[in-house]
Every structure is written in structure tokens, then in C-alpha cells.
């Protein structure tokens, strides 16, 4: 019997090898990088600048190691060429993966990722991972289903190639908001996704600022929760705002614990809460403000900004209550329409986000500042690989 004809690959297929993101090139690694001072402030957190008319996101350089990271592991191991640690990136956020690899002094592993003409995903590792400690950097960001499936197939490929350990590094964990039933006959999709990642062959998950703490319990494998607050705190501290002028605001009751912890680290600033009622998905109505913001610089903190309805209505209320300036801070910038229109409408002095999700050029606006989490993720990966403490990074 004749063998079946091979399926054709779509013309839009792409590869996540070292050439997949030509627009953002990491600086060359220096053999003396391990001896750099760690007291220098992070300078990757400047607002976006225009280069030849196009927005440019600052990338890591030799002076960009944030002060809260003091890695003895980096000093002793960053230049080891015989490490059994392998970093791979999916196609969801290759720029972040490149920055993480640069910080760690490693090259991204070579992997071919393509799409068949019918939309199916093809993954082939182009180097051996046998006996290696493999870390796959792939946020399950929009399009969530496609990026999730790509992650699962990459995990499966590593497992079948005899990797010793496989860690799924998920800067943004899609479906995290579907963490409980709010009505009858609903799915708990966060638990389902956790099961899929586990069954695919992952031994560990590393995730940034999960929407709710209980999501960690949905996994039957260890989960390292990376808190990105130090990155934002470091940036706010560099702005020189008087501590007596600050107030941290939670945009809803569910984020009070997060905002309280943030306020304590931000010069023990006072806390305010926006009480709102949600009548439908992606629709929020601001009802009341608990706390005093008159004449203050209000820092609104949330784990993510999706349509920006909650945080924008909260900012409007803060201005009505006499706030001098309002800053919006979040880890995950989902930016579903009409988020950009709302955020750039003038309610915010600055919108501070991180690069756990890639931000399309069309979504850049004047008040936007993008902070890099690459140092934090790279340090966490080293410590997981070394069986060292991760929680000590955030103490």
C-alpha cells in the first residue's frame, strides 16, 4: 500500500528558533557579566519611546539588574557552558523568552513550530534534551486556545524526547478567571487546563501573579507562584513620590489582599477600596469608595487589565473624590477592546504594565509604560534548577 501523502504546511507557518523575533535582539553576553553590581536600579522601566516613528520597548542591558535580586547562583553559574538546563520558547511571547535567556547567560533551545494548512500545530525539537532540566516559556495569552495547545504539544515533545524534568513557565495563565462556579452548570476551566498541562507531562509549573490563589491547588504537581510586585514597586520608588502623598487603591473587593500587601511595601501607604457591582461578564459598575483619596496620588493595582472597564470607572470615581493623580498598575495587559480607548482617555497619569503578555504596536499609547519581568523569571528558573528557595526572592 502506498504511504499517505504528507500534509502541506501553511505559508504563514513560523519557527521559534533563534531567528523568530528579529525586531528585538538581545545584547551580546559578556564573560564578566556575573560580577556586575546588583545595587543599580533597573533602567528597563522607562516609558515607551519612539524610534523612527515606531514605539520601542526598552530591553535588558548591562545596567538593568534590579536591586531586589541578589543572585549568588548567577555569580557562580551564569557562564557554565555544560549546564543541563534547557530553555525553549513557544510563539506566544518570544521577546520575553529572549530576555530571560540573556539574563541567564543561555541560548534559547532550537525548536521548529509550524502550522499545517488545516491549522494543526507541529512541533519538533532540533536539539537533544535527554536527561535535561527543560523550561518551556509560553504564556497562554490570546489566542488562548492556540497558545495552550502549542504549550501542550511542546511539553509532550520534551517528554517523548526523554527530558528529565519539564517545567511549564506560564507568565500569563489563561482561563485563570474560570476558577469557580458562579452559576449552575458551569465548567471550572482553570482546573481542566491544570489537568491538561499535568497529563501532557509537565513536572512543575511556574506562573506569574495568578488571578486567585486557589488556582495553584488545581495542579497535582508543584507550582511556583512568581509575584511581579517587586518590578512595579522598584519603578514607583524611582519616581520619587512623597510617601505622605500616596494611597493604594483596590479596584474591587476581591483585590483587597493584593492591594494591602502592595501598600505595606510601598512605604506602608494607606489603602482605599472601590466597591462595585458586576451585572454581566466584562461589564462593571462603580458604586462607592471606601477610604480617603483627596489630594493624594492614587495607585490602582490589579492583577490584569482586560477591557479596562473596572479600573477606568474606578479612576473616574477617584477623580470625583479629589485624587490629584491616578496611576494604573497591573501585571497582565490583556487589553481586549475597548481597553486602549478607555486607558488613553485621560483618566490616568500613567498606565504601568509588565511584559508577561506581548503588547501589539497598535495598542501603544502615550501614558503606557512596560516593565520587564525577565530578570525575575530568570532568577526563579535558576533557583528551581538549583533546588534553591524561590520564596526568598520576594521577602
Swiss-Prot record:
Annotated positions binding Mg(2+): 209, 211, 220, 224
A Pfam family that the UniProt record links to this protein: Pribosyltran_N
Entry annotated with the keyword Hydrolase: no
EC numbers for this chain: 2.7.6.1
GO BP, sorted A to Z: 5-phosphoribose 1-diphosphate biosynthetic process; purine nucleotide biosynthetic process; ribonucleoside monophosphate biosynthetic process
PROSITE patterns, alphabetized: PRPP_SYNTHASE (PS00114)
InterPro entries, per the entry: PRib_PP_synth_CS, Pribosyltran_N, PRibTrfase_dom, PRTase-like, Rib-P_diPkinase, Rib-P_diPkinase_bac
Keywords: ATP-binding, Chloroplast, Kinase, Magnesium, Metal-binding, Nucleotide biosynthesis, Nucleotide-binding, Plastid, Transferase, Transit peptide
Molecular functions (GO terms): ATP binding; kinase activity; magnesium ion binding; ribose phosphate diphosphokinase activity
Targeting signal (transit peptide) range: 1-42
Superkingdom of the source species: Eukaryota
Enzyme class: transferase
Catalytic activity: D-ribose 5-phosphate + ATP = 5-phospho-alpha-D-ribose 1-diphosphate + AMP + H(+)
Region (Binding of phosphoribosylpyrophosphate): 295-310
Biased composition (Low complexity): 1-23
Similarity comment: family membership: Belongs to the ribose-phosphate pyrophosphokinase family.
Protein name: Ribose-phosphate pyrophosphokinase 2, chloroplastic
Biological source species: Spinacia oleracea
Amino acid at each position: 500500500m502506498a504511504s499517505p501523502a504528507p500534509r502541506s504546511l501553511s505559508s504563514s507557518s513560523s519557527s521559534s528558533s533563534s531567528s523568530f523575533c528579529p525586531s528585538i535582539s538581545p545584547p551580546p553576553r559578556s564573560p564578566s557579566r556575573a560580577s556586575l553590581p546588583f545595587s543599580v536600579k533597573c533602567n528597563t522601566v522607562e516609558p515607551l519611546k519612539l524610534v523612527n516613528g515606531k514605539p520601542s520597548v526598552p530591553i535588558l542591558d548591562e545596567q538593568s539588574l534590579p536591586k531586589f535580586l541578589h543572585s549568588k547562583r548567577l555569580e557562580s553559574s551564569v557562564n557554565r557552558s555544560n549546564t543541563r538546563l534547557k530553555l525553549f520558547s513557544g510563539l506566544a511571547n518570544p521577546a520575553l523568552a529572549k530576555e530571560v535567556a540573556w539574563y541567564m547567560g543561555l541560548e534559547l533551545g532550537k525548536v521548529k513550530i509550524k502550522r499545517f494548512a488545516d491549522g494543526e500545530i507541529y512541533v519538533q525539537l532540533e536539539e537533544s534534551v535527554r536527561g535535561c532540566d527543560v523550561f518551556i516559556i509560553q504564556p497562554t495569552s490570546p489566542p488562548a486556545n492556540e497558545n495552550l495547545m502549542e504549550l501542550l504539544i511542546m511539553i509532550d515533545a520534551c517528554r517523548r524526547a526523554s527530558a528529565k524534568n519539564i517545567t511549564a513557565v506560564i507568565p500569563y495563565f489563561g482561563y485563570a478567571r474560570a476558577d469557580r462556579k458562579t452559576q449552575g452548570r458551569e465548567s471550572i476551566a482553570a482546573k481542566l487546563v491544570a489537568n491538561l498541562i499535568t497529563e501532557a507531562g509537565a513536572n512543575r509549573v511556574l506562573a506569574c501573579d495568578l488571578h486567585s490563589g486557589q488556582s495553584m491547588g488545581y495542579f497535582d504537581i508543584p507550582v511556583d507562584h512568581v509575584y511581579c510586585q517587586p518590578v512595579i514597586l522598584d519603578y514607583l520608588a524611582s519616581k520619587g513620590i512623597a510617601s505622605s502623598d500616596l494611597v493604594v487603591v483596590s479596584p474591587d473587593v476581591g483585590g483587597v489582599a493584593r492591594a494591602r500587601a502592595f501598600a505595606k511595601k510601598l512605604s506602608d501607604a494607606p489603602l482605599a477600596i472601590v466597591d462595585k457591582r458586576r451585572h454581566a461578564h466584562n461589564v462593571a459598575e462603580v458604586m462607592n469608595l471606601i477610604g480617603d483619596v483627596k489630594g493624594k496620588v492614587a495607585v490602582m493595582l490589579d492583577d490584569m487589565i482586560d477591557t479596562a472597564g473596572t479600573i477606568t470607572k474606578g479612576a473616574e470615581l477617584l477623580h470625583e473624590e479629589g485624587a490629584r493623580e491616578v496611576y494604573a498598575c497591573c501585571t497582565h495587559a490583556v487589553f481586549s477592546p475597548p481597553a486602549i480607548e478607555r486607558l488613553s482617555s485621560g483618566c490616568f497619569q500613567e498606565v504601568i504594565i509588565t511584559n508577561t503578555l506581548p503588547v501589539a504596536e497598535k495598542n501603544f499609547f502615550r501614558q503606557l509604560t512596560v516593565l520587564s519581568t525577565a530578570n525575575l523569571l530568570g532568577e526563579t528558573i535558576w533557583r528551581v534548577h538549583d533546588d534553591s528557595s524561590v520564596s526568598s526572592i520576594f521577602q
